[in-house]
Amino acid sequence: MELSPNNSTDQSLLDAQLELWHTTFAFMKSMALKSAIHLRIADAIHLHGGAASLSQILSKVHLHPSRVSSLRRLMRVLTTTNVFGTQPLGGGSDDDSEPVYTLTPVSRLLIGSQSSQLAQTPLAAMVLDPTIVSPFSELGAWFQHELPDPCIFKHTHGRGIWELTKDDATFDALVNDGLASDSQLIVDVAIKQSAEVFQGISSLVDVGGGIGAAAQAISKAFPHVKCSVLDLAHVVAKAPTHTDVQFIAGDMFESIPPADAVLLKSVLHDWDHDDCVKILKNCKKAIPPREAGGKVIIINMVVGAGPSDMKHKEMQAIFDVYIMFINGMERDEQEWSKIFSEAGYSDYRIIPVLGVRSIIEVYP
Ligand SMILES: C[S@@+](CC[C@H](N)C(=O)[O-])C[C@H]1O[C@@H](n2cnc3c(N)ncnc32)[C@H](O)[C@@H]1O
């Protein structure tokens, strides 16, 4: 016999607690994902043709013998969060039937690593690294107090993020690879969804372009476009050498090499209003007038643009608070528009074809 609370106040209390628990324990979803990446469970299932029982997964992942029985519990979280699926087993009682785990569109993004065009494991590994996660414990205090440094990341680690990437090679690789994996996926979609953005230009400089994943994708799709990357010297030092893309060490706050178009992907949301204006003023000096094809191509969120379902809205809101850790922000159209006009641009066009993100073409 099923017992349930017999008064609606009790039921509402339980519902409220459940809702609260969902948010309180949401970090366990992230930690389960982090474990799955660490154990390379997606690869193990992939090696079994996309569907594998627990014992087949166990034959491919390295587990301490005492932890074997816990893997099923981890898989239960990963299936309820849609990272993996399960195949119903025909016959046998529930107790003795072994579930078969399958890849979902989500876990297909976890197969392989840098070698795979779509692999998103490096970005997840970056976001879930303690260096990035730990500053958020200070978020409440940051709202209340004048901290010695207004940047939560700097407050926690004693250095800004780009100073830390300079000093810590492991963290630098984590950031470079993480962002490169995102660039590979999103720039590929941008090229397919909005090829006209890259047509009609003969040169492009990717400012803050990291190790060049976006520039390489553009150069491959549009071989007539001469692509270069401007980034800090310690990042450029790690860039690939056998590529058509030219890497230039420099500081975007000082000067930007000339090109028909400047790409800024996941860069401006790292900076406050005034810094964005400074960067865009330098971009304007680097490009020809609008009539000659000059433009800045931004890939970032435009809060409120794109699909308006709850998942997209929630992700934009979460990302805006996430990027607070380095004093960055996600912006709505009005906020972007103010930056563009202060930096001396005449017009812009938002192309909301990248899910939670958009392409913005900005014209001098
Ligand atoms: C969030 S990452 C984006 C990387 C790349 N655009 C992507 O999305 O894959 C920001 C990049 O800006 C670079 N950066 C930071 N300060 C810079 C500066 N003053 N001049 C040039 N690049 C800078 C960082 O080294 C880093 O590669």
UniProtKB/Swiss-Prot annotation:
S-adenosyl-L-methionine binds at residues 208, 231, 251-252, 265. The active site is at residue 269. Its EC number is 2.1.1.-. GO terms for molecular function: O-methyltransferase activity; protein dimerization activity; S-adenosylmethionine-dependent methyltransferase activity. Transmembrane segments: none annotated. GO terms for biological process: biosynthetic process; methylation. PROSITE patterns: SAM_OMT_II (PS51683). Keywords: Methyltransferase, S-adenosyl-L-methionine, Transferase. Coiled coil: none annotated. It holds the Pfam family Dimerisation. Accumulates preferentially in the roots and is located predominantly in the region of the endodermis, low levels are seen in the leaves, stems and other shoot organs. Belongs to the class I-like SAM-binding methyltransferase superfamily. Cation-independent O-methyltransferase family. COMT subfamily. May be involved in the O-methylation of suberin phenylpropanoid precursors. Homodimer. This is O-methyltransferase ZRP4. It comes from Zea mays (Maize).
